[in-house]
């Protein structure tokens, strides 16, 4: 059974924990409390299997605290990560400015492929859902960008996340198959 490690990273108060709980069908948190370090959520998704072989997959979603005081822990968090989801609050201009730093630290430095990264522009309840005005600079504009609004259209983000998980598992499965073939030849 394949097991994938996915990091949820991004600025403080971007909605990482709320999204992580929703996408893993974990408990709801009604009051804001900053994540201290990391919170690991383990889950399975019946819609995601390994290369259509029917083999189940397990996931670890690492909900990483966005405070810079945890920066010294980031290398340990990144170890053996298969994917990174950068979550930001699209309504806060400073979050947009921080995006390149998160991308550099969690995607470029550990040499992950852009396909292993997804951006989520999270819109908090009551903030509106302005999908049209978000322009990102290179290299962020090459990444998959999904808008989330759990109040208006929660299933859209769930479906996009399942697609993302499938792409991560397919990549892992192909890599494992290549490794097995190289051993046999």
From Swiss-Prot:
One Gene Ontology biological process: intracellular protein transport
Pfam families linked to this entry: Roc (PF08477)
UniProt keyword terms in alphabetical order: Cell projection, Cilium, GTP-binding, Nucleotide-binding, Phosphoprotein
Residues engaged in binding GTP: 10-17, 63-67, 123-126
InterPro entries reported for this sequence: P-loop_NTPase (IPR027417)
Primary subcellular site in the record, as a coarse category: other
Keyword Lipid metabolism found: no
GO CC field: centrosome; ciliary tip; cilium; endomembrane system; intraciliary transport particle B
Single GO term (MF): GTPase activity
Modified residues (Phosphoserine): 137
UniProt keyword Membrane present: no
Compartments, as annotated in UniProt: Cell projection, Cilium
Subunit (UniProt): Component of the IFT complex B, at least composed of IFT20, IFT22, IFT25, IFT27, IFT46, IFT52, TRAF3IP1/IFT54, IFT57, IFT74, IFT80, IFT81, and IFT88. Interacts with IFT88. Interacts with CFAP61.
PANTHER family: DRAB5-RELATED
Family: Belongs to the small GTPase superfamily. Rab family.
Job of this protein: Small GTPase-like component of the intraflagellar transport (IFT) complex B.
Name used for this protein in its record: Intraflagellar transport protein 22 homolog
Native source organism of the sequence: Homo sapiens
């Amino acid at each position: 059974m394949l097991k994938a490690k996915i990091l949820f990273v991004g600025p403080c108060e971007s909605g990482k924990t709320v999204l992580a709980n929703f996408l893993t069908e974990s408990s709801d948190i009604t009051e804001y409390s900053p994540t201290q370090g990391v919170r690991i959520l383990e889950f399975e998704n019946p819609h995601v299997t390994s290369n259509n072989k029917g083999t189940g997959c397990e996931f670890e979603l690492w909900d990483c605290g966005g405070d810079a005081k945890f920066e010294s822990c980031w290398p340990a968090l990144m170890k053996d990560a298969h994917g990174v989801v950068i979550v930001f609050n699209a309504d806060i201009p400073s979050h947009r400015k921080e995006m390149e730093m998160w991308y550099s630290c969690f995607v470029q430095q550990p040499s992950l492929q852009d396909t292993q990264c997804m951006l989520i522009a999270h819109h908090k309840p009551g903030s509106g859902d302005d999908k049209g005005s978000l322009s990102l600079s290179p290299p962020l504009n090459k990444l998959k960008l999904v808008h989330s609004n759990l109040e208006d259209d929660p299933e859209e983000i769930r479906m996009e996340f399942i697609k993302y998980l499938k792409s991560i598992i397919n990549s892992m499965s192909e890599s494992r198959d290549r490794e097995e073939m190289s051993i046999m030849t």
